[in-house]
């Protein structure tokens, strides 16, 4: 079957899609019998009660998530999938085939994080929104820099108006400054 692959929230767009847009994607997928694969690893940090998952609006959604981004725990290497029964069983079979075990430490850390998720998200919200304000203040002073400010998420897309292609700029930055 066909698959429509979409990240929610989009790291490039720095925004979440609203229920209307999710519904439109679901209708397109439904019209061609496609699954919609969504990585929802960047859950919103504000208006969380209004957030809708693709799994809320489409019966053939496959939604992935993890503790890595919103919960700031990439070391746990723990994630999850929401799908229909057939999809869940296929994914579980593949996971069992490719992974011997998840690790007791990983499970314990994941349990702790989820038990304290509200405190963790509140801490992250303060950091992200504080950094967003700092970035906005700096961008406001730069005539060759613009961005799509993040809307409730921790990622954004910064654009440079420079007379150089991206690859050349990155190579020069690495060569001259030792950073990439």
Give names to the regions the model predicted.
Residues 20-27, 134-137, 168, 172:
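Alpha-helical scaffolding segments of alpha/beta enzyme cores, especially the outer helices
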Residues 31-32, 142, 177:
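Helix C-cap/helix->beta junction micro-motif
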Residues 15-36, 40-73:
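Active-site pre-lysine segment of PLP-dependent enzymes
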Residues 1-16:
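N-terminal low-complexity segments that are often proline-rich with Ser/Thr-Pro
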Residues 111, 127-136, 147-160, 166:
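Conserved glycine-rich beta-strand-loop-beta hairpin in the small C-terminal domain of fold type I
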Residues 146, 159-180:
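Conserved C-terminal alpha-helix-loop-beta "cap" of PLP-dependent enzymes
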Residues 62-129, 136-138:
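Conserved core segment of the aminotransferase class I/II
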């Amino acid at each position: 079957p066909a698959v429509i692959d979409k990240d929610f929230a989009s790291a490039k767009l720095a925004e979440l899609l609203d229920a209307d847009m999710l519904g439109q994607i679901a209708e397109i997928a439904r019209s061609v019998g496609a699954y919609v694969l969504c990585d929802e690893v960047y859950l919103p940090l504000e208006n969380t009660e209004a957030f809708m998952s693709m799994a809320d609006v489409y019966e053939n959604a496959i939604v992935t998530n993890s503790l890595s981004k919103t919960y700031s725990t990439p070391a746990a290497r723990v994630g999850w999938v929401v799908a229909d029964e057939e999809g869940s069983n296929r994914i579980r079979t593949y996971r069992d085939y490719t992974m011997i075990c998840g690790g007791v430490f990983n499970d314990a850390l994941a349990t702790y994080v989820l038990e304290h998720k509200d405190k963790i998200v509140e801490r992250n919200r303060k950091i992200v929104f504080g950094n967003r304000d700092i970035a906005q203040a700096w961008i406001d002073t730069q005539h060759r820099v613009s961005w799509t400010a993040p809307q409730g998420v921790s990622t954004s897309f910064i654009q440079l108006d420079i007379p150089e292609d991206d690859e050349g700029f990155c190579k020069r930055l690495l060569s001259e400054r030792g950073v990439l």
